[in-house]
Regions:
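Active-site phosphate-binding strand-loop segment of PLP-dependent enzymes
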Residues: 125-194
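PLP-dependent aminotransferase-like
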Residues: 89-150
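A short helix->loop->beta-strand "cap" motif at the edges of active sites that frequently abuts
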Residues: 95, 116, 175-178, 204
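N-terminal small-domain helix-loop-helix segment of the aminotransferase-like
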Residues: 1-78, 85, 261-262, 367-371
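Conserved glycine-rich beta-strand-loop-beta hairpin in the small C-terminal domain of fold type I
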Residues: 21, 257, 273-281, 293-306, ...
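Helix C-cap/helix->beta junction micro-motif
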Residues: 114, 143, 175-176, 288, ...
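PLP-dependent enzyme catalytic core of the Aspartate aminotransferase-like
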Residues: 320-328, 335-371
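Conserved core segment of the aminotransferase class I/II
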Residues: 207-275, 282, 365, 369
Length: 371
C-alpha cells in the first residue's frame, strides 16, 4: 500500500520542513497532557480483553446517546486494528462489500486480501464530494452484501454525511442483513456545531470506529475502539481481537483513559486551533487560480486539486515540492485518485509551517507547469 511506504514516518521527518501530509492534529508530549498518573504503580499484566474499564466508560460517556454503554465498547490497538477486525470477522471470499471511495486503505485492502467482491462507490469533486445516499443504497444487495463501509467526516475530503443520511444507510444495510461500518475518527472535529451521536446507536448491526490519534494528537498511544450495541456482533469482534492481540497495552489504555476523563478540558482548545488553521487555508484558497477544493466540514484534511485548465506535470510537482521546498502532501494515488489531487493536512504543522507550505505549493506548481 503506497500510503504506508510513502508515509512521512517512513520517508523520514528529517527530510520534510513543512509537513502538510499528516491527517491528525499535532503530536503531543506526555508532559503536556496534565495527567495525574503513576506509571510506576501499574502492573504490566494482560489487561481486560475488552479494554480498560475506565477507558470504555469514558468512550461511552462521549457517545452523545444513552443507547451506548461501556459494555458496548471494544478497545483496540488503534482504529486501524478495529477496521481490520471488522473485515476479518465478517467477510469470507466472495462476500459482497460496498465501500465509499476514497477511503482509508485498510477498508479497501483488507476485503481485497480476503477475496471479497469489493464494489466501490466513488465520490467526485463535481458533486462536492457529497455522498449520494440513494445511489449508495442501490448498491446494497439483500442477502448478499455483508458489509457497507462509510467514513464521516471523510478522509481525505473532510465532507460530512448528515446524521439523517447515516440513518438511512443504516436502515438499508440492516434490511439487507449487512453490517454497517462507520469510521468516525474525526467526529470530535466538526467545524460547525456539536458532533452527532455515535452511529452505533442506530442499530445492533452498526459499528462505530474511532481513536485517540486524529483529534487528540496521540497516535503514539496505540488506542482505538469499535462500538457496537449488538451482542452477537460484539462477541465476534472480541473473538477476532483475542486471536490477533489478546488484549491491549496497559500503559496506552491507562493514558487514554486519563485524557478522555478530561475530554471537556482537552478538546475545546484543539477544536478552536483547528478552526483557526482552516481559516488560514480559506484565506489562501480565496486567492487561488491554480488550486481548488471543496471546503471540509470536519477533520483536519481536505482534498485539493489543480484547476481543470491548469496544465501541469503532476509527478514533477510532487518531486520538486519536496526536493526544492521541503514540503510534503499526500498524493492522490494514496487514495486511488489522480495525482492532480493531493490531501492537504492543516492540523499537524505549526501555523508558520502551514503558511510556508501553502506558499511552497504555488512555487512548485509554477515550476511544474507545462508550456
Amino acid at each position: 500500500m503506497p500510503i504506508e511506504v510513502e508515509s512521512p514516518e517512513q520517508l523520514g521527518y528529517d527530510t520534510i520542513t513543512n509537513n502538510l501530509s499528516e491527517s491528525s492534529v499535532a503530536d503531543r508530549r506526555l508532559v503536556d497532557l496534565g495527567l495525574d498518573v503513576d506509571l510506576d504503580a501499574l502492573v504490566l499484566c494482560y489487561g481486560d480483553h475488552l479494554g480498560d474499564p475506565a477507558l470504555r466508560a469514558a468512550i461511552a460517556a462521549s457517545a452523545g446517546t444513552d443507547t451506548v454503554d461501556a459494555e458496548h465498547v471494544l478497545v483496540t490497538p488503534g482504529a486501524a486494528t478495529a477496521l481490520f477486525l471488522v473485515a476479518t470477522s465478517q467477510l469470507e471470499p466472495g462476500d459482497h462489500v460496498v465501500v465509499v471511495r476514497s477511503n482509508y486503505a485498510t477498508n479497501l485492502e483488507t476485503p481485497r486480501a480476503i477475496g471479497a467482491e469489493l464494489e466501490c462507490h466513488d465520490l467526485s469533486f463535481e458533486d462536492g464530494w457529497r455522498l449520494d445516499v440513494d445511489a449508495l443504497c442501490a448498491r446494497i444487495r439483500p442477502g448478499a452484501t455483508k458489509l457497507v463501509s462509510i467514513t464521516t467526516p471523510h478522509n481525505p475530503t473532510g465532507t460530512v454525511v448528515a446524521p439523517a443520511d447515516v440513518a438511512r444507510i443504516a436502515t438499508a444495510a440492516g434490511d439487507a442483513g449487512a453490517v454497517l461500518l462507520v469510521d468516525e475518527t474525526y467526529r470530535d472535529l466538526t467545524h460547525d456545531g456539536a458532533p452527532p451521536p455515535l452511529a452505533a446507536a442506530l442499530g445492533e448491526h452498526v459499528v462505530s470506529v474511532s481513536s485517540m490519534s486524529k483529534a487528540y494528537g496521540l497516535p503514539g498511544i496505540r488506542t482505538g475502539w469499535a462500538v457496537c450495541t449488538g451482542e452477537a456482533l460484539a462477541e465476534q469482534l472480541l473473538a477476532a481481537k483475542e486471536q490477533v492481540v489478546i488484549s491491549g497495552s496497559i500503559i496506552d489504555e491507562h493514558l487514554a483513559a486519563g485524557v478522555l476523563a478530561r475530554r471537556d478540558e482537552v478538546l475545546p482548545p484543539i477544536v478552536a486551533d483547528v478552526r483557526a488553521r482552516l481559516a488560514i487555508v480559506d484565506e489562501w484558497m480565496a486567492g487561488q487560480s491554480t488550486f481548488e477544493w471543496v471546503r471540509p466540514d470536519g477533520g483536519v484534511v481536505g482534498l485539493v486539486r489543480f484547476g481543470p485548465d491548469v496544465a501541469v506535470d503532476d509527478a514533477a510537482f510532487h518531486r520538486v515540492l519536496l526536493a526544492d521546498h521541503g514540503t510534503y502532501v499526500g498524493p492522490g494515488h494514496w487514495f486511488e485518485q489522480s495525482d492532480r489531487c493531493f490531501r492537504l493536512g492543516f492540523g499537524w504543522p505549526t501555523h508558520e509551517e502551514l503558511r510556508a507550505g501553502l506558499a511552497a505549493l504555488e512555487a512548485a506548481a509554477a515550476q511544474a507547469q507545462l508550456p
